[in-house]
Design a protein with these regions (language model features):
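Generic hydrophobic alpha-helical scaffold/packing signal
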Residues: 18, 93, 135, 139-143
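Nudix hydrolase/Nudix homology domain
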Residues: 2-44
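Conserved active-site loop/cleft motifs that coordinate metal ions or position small ligands
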Residues: 20, 29-32, 103-107, 152-158
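Aromatic-rich peripheral "rim/lid" segments of glycoside hydrolase catalytic domains that contact
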Residues: 66, 115, 120-123, 132-137, ...
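Alpha-helical elements of Rossmann-like donor-binding domains used by nucleotide-donor carbohydrate transfer enzymes
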Residues: 33-37, 140, 185
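Short beta-strand/loop segments at the ligand-binding rim of alpha/beta enzyme cores
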Residues: 47-54
């Protein structure tokens, strides 16, 4: 992302957003580190943007970013295997406590496909439709995350621009969550957590 793109992003952000998240899910973040430092400069026009700034690295990279002090909020992609949530949150927690910043998952989700609970980030995974796989994964994520007071929320992947009908959704093995059984789990979680530190 060059200076022209950053300025355009700045113009849109000032008008439209309360939080700006730079995402690329990249492992080599030297360019983004420079971008974050530029964003934090008080003498630049960018300071017209008064919202929060975050960066969303790919999963497993949270403790490899050396410039979290340049952003307001630490974020990450939450595509962890169903049986590894606790250990990954333990690892992420060390970074969150070190930098003393809020944290959220800027992207998290799982397909409704057999086997996707173990490799939720692999959208190319072939397998049969299994709606319960998605439900199990979300239950595991929410159960592990609700015990972490430093975790402030999730951007769930995915909400399609065109919502499917219930009959379409129940045949859909993608990350889509609308009109699927997992929607009930998500609703219950947020109803229960309303007013707590997670919200």
């Amino acid at each position: 992302m060059g200076p022209a793109e950053v300025l355009k992003l700045h113009e849109v952000s000032v008008k439209e957003f309360q939080t700006l998240v730079a995402t690329g899910e990249v492992k080599h973040v030297a360019g983004l580190a420079a971008w974050a430092r530029w964003m934090s400069r008080e003498d630049e026009k960018i300071m017209e943007y008064h919202g929060l700034v975050s960066y969303n690295p790919d999963k497993y990279q949270e403790d490899h970013v050396s410039w979290w002090d340049c952003v307001d909020v630490i974020s990450s992609s939450g595509y962890y295997p169903i049986d590894q949530w606790e250990q990954e949150l333990d690892r992420i927690e060390k970074t969150v406590l070190k930098y003393r910043k809020p944290f959220f998952f800027a992207e998290a989700g799982c397909m409704s496909r057999k086997g996707s609970g173990m490799i939720p980030n692999n959208w190319e995974l072939q397998g049969e439709l299994r709606l319960e796989e998605q439900c199990e994964w979300y239950r595991a994520m929410f159960e592990a995350c609700k015990k972490r007071p430093w975790l402030r929320g999730f951007a769930l992947w995915k909400w399609a621009p065109k919502l499917p009908s219930a009959s379409e959704a129940w045949k859909d093995d993608s990350y889509e969550i609308c009109e699927k059984p997992v929607q009930v789990i998500i609703k219950r979680f947020y109803e229960h957590e309303a007013g707590t530190s997670l919200m």
